Amino acid sequence: MTANQWQTFFRLCAKILGAGSRHAAQSKSWCAWTTFGSLSESVHYWAAGLPADADLENVGTTDSGTWGQPFLYKDLAHVIIPREFYWEIIEPGRLENGTRQQDISALSNELISAGIEHRLTELVLEIKLY
């Protein structure tokens, strides 16, 4: 995937799935991702809403954006978007939770039109580069 393809992917995600946030309860979209660096060291996956257009720079995502820190596009190894994600709010005297659906089938159709290779299953849409 080129930087331009990643930008197209993330812009289509925001258009189809909605605005992302670091907190699932405030997010219309959700994903998990890892990097080649993480795969070679500790195999860590991060999770947050999908980046907004303002989070996308020429070589990667911005610092302090939806993902909280910068990630180079060339280092992204695996991005997973679930069809459904769980959210909760836990505060003193308040507990709310639920799930949100993500129309990954519609996203898949847009990605096909844009020439972005991906995999769609009943549970997830993913881009896996390893």
Name the predicted role of every residue range.
Residues 1-120, 130:
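Structured alpha/beta or helical-core interaction and ligand-binding surfaces enriched in interleaved
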